[in-house]
């Protein structure tokens, strides 16, 4: 005796997800799920259209006789026997339902389907079905063909169910070779237990477990599993952008892109982070943001195993390994691996500084520079050293500071092998070898290898001395000079020589003094070969060869090759005698004269004549 048989319905190949499973799907997977379900529904419908005589025997448990029922009405009939009401809204009247696919999900855990409109169907169709054992009228005529709805998803009773949306007018145009349904990859809902075992037509359709990529683009040759994906792809070649923004006129090839774009004008940010409350205009942006809280970094570099939380960051990182720099500056030809770096670089040519500080009005070419600058006003120092507890306003400064603890010096000079803990220090050092002086004074055309040296030099022209000593009122053009000067009043000498215990108020003075003990003279004159233990001494000596006397007296016009000589000479005009003897109160205009005078009080006579042994002070 043959087993009871039932018609194949969409429920036989339906795929259902629970709410928890749905949350785990990303937007691309959800879109793919929808496309698969739509295609399966089309294929089942096409079987009825291409073979209108395809019927199946259904054994009625209530009447004991056989009824001939079409696929389109079986599911509606069975829902009343099984008591399954999840699909009754679909079954009332397939012509009187209208749904609209929402292009963008309301949030990350809601199902992407909202019922927009539902037209009331006839309530007495149930009675018409069960009035007797008459076969149900064929509902698959031309009217059904012109209004055949597509499948969509909606959330109900903890399941992602299936609903119907719009008409398929081209279902009959799908060839038999294209009507191969995709085998479900998750739990298949089959509440009726009726397998279409004896149907050779269905067996033929289900032989292929995975759909072949039978839909090929004529332009690019790319193949797709589903005709809907092919249609979306072909829009790229056609340049078709049918969705236009009413505000700015920008056009898009997908409605969901237009919906997301409109939020730029409205400022709408419907997606909110539960951790920090930050809102976003796109669900993808919220998903990426959540990784900052979870620490998730799903994108990993195959070369160095470095992981990233954003796919775009991994793409940029890969260019480091490949050495790829696709973005080129049209002005100087310099290339960059990131378009943002090129944008910032272009501002060097244009002089554009679009980022302005609201506190002091200072402008910057980079937003990150403005952010760092703003911390000067707020005093914020969010970056803390775990070793010593020192805080910094910039992450890069903290990174450089950590190298003081570790002793790391990753930047090495290829010329002399000297190593540095900062990249900027290596760049400055390179200029010693190349002789490059990129910083030029606009007043006197003098050039410098360091920007700080240029800033100091400019103060000479404008006569600006912004830094004033609170003790004596003396002003300085550099804050470092003021700090050094302040030590004269305090008597502080924090730098101590380990050899003789002598103290100094400047670190450079200690370094120079240390060479007296070691005998080191690293500075050599290229003209005569004479060596010096101080760079300033070499510079003074070099002027003897060149005859250069850059220091001029404004009173008498006399010139000098050393700044100290000019200062000493200037006191002849002013009558200033800043050096005073603590013993007798006598004053002198030169420090050397005070030292000579001081020997009269001490009786010291350091200079001895070798012939007779007589000593002099």
Swiss-Prot record:
GO terms for biological process: regulation of transcription by RNA polymerase II. Its main location: nucleus. Keywords: DNA-binding, Metal-binding, Nucleus, Repeat, Transcription, Transcription regulation, Zinc, Zinc-finger. One of its GO terms (molecular function) is DNA-binding transcription factor activity, RNA polymerase II-specific. The keyword Cell inner membrane does not apply. Residues 8-81 form the KRAB domain. One of its GO terms (cellular component) is nucleus. May be involved in transcriptional regulation. This is Zinc finger protein 813. It comes from Homo sapiens (Human).
């Amino acid at each position: 005796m043959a087993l009871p048989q039932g018609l194949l319905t969409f429920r036989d190949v339906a795929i259902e997800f629970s709410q928890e499973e749905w949350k785990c799907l990303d937007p691309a997977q959800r879109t793919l799920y929808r496309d698969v379900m739509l295609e399966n529904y089309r294929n089942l419908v096409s079987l009825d259209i291409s073979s209108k005589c395809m019927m199946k025997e259904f054994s009625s448990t209530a009447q004991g006789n056989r009824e001939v029922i079409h696929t389109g009405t079986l599911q509606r009939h069975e829902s009343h026997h099984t008591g399954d009401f999840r699909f009754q809204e679909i079954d009332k009247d397939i012509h009187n339902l209208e749904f609209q696919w929402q292009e963008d999900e309301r949030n990350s855990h809601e199902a992407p389907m909202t019922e927009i409109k539902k037209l009331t169907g006839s309530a007495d169709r149930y009675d018409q079905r069960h009035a007797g054992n008459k076969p149900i009228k064929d509902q698959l005529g031309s009217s059904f063909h012109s209004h055949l709805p597509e499948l969509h998803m909606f959330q109900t009773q903890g399941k992602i169910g299936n609903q119907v949306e719009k008409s398929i007018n081209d279902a009959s145009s799908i060839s038999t070779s294209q009507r191969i349904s995709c085998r479900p990859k998750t739990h298949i809902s089959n509440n009726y237990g009726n397998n279409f075992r004896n149907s050779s037509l269905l067996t033929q359709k289900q032989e292929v477990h995975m759909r072949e990529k039978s839909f090929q683009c004529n332009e690019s040759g790319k193949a797709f599993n589903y005709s809907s994906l092919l249609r979306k792809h072909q829009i790229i070649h056609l340049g078709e952008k049918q969705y236009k923004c009413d505000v700015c006129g920008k056009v898009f090839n997908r409605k969901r892109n237009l919906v997301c774009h409109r939020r730029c004008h409205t400022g709408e940010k419907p997606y909110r982070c539960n951790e920090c409350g930050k809102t976003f205009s796109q669900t993808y942006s919220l998903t990426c943001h959540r990784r900052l809280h979870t620490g998730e970094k799903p994108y990993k570099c195959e070369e160095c195993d470095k992981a990233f939380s954003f796919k775009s960051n991994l793409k940029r990182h890969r260019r480091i390994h490949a050495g790829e720099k696709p973005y080129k500056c049209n002005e100087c030809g310099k290339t960059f691996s990131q378009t943002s770096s090129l944008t910032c670089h272009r501002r060097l040519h244009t002089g554009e500084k679009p980022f302005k500080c609201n506190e002091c009005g200072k402008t910057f070419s980079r937003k990150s520079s403005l952010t760092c600058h703003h911390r000067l006003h707020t005093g914020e120092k969010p970056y803390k050293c775990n070793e010593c507890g020192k805080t910094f306003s910039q992450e890069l400064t903290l990174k450089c500071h950590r190298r003081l603890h570790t002793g790391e010096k990753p930047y090495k000079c290829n010329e002399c092998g000297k190593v540095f803990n900062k990249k900027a220090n290596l760049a400055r050092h390179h200029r010693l070898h190349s002789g490059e002086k990129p910083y030029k004074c606009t007043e006197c055309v003098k050039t410098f290898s360091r920007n700080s040296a240029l800033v100091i030099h400019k103060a000479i022209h404008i006569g600006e001395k912004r830094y004033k000593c609170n003790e004596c009122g003396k002003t300085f053009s550099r804050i470092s000079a003021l700090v050094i000067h302040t030590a004269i009043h305090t008597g502080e000498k924090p730098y101590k020589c380990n050899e003789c215990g002598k103290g100094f108020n400047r670190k450079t003075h200690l370094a120079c003094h240390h060479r007296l003990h070691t005998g080191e003279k690293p500075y050599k004159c290229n003209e005569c070969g004479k060596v010096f233990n101080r760079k300033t001494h070499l510079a003074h000596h070099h002027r003897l060869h060149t005859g250069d006397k850059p220091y001029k007296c404004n009173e008498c016009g006399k010139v000098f090759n050393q700044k100290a000589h000019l200062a000493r000479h200037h006191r002849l005009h002013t009558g200033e005698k800043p050096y005073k003897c603590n013993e007798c109160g006598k004053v002198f205009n030169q420090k050397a004269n005070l030292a000579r005078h001081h020997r009269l009080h001490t009786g010291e006579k350091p200079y001895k004549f070798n012939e007779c042994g007589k000593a002099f002070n």
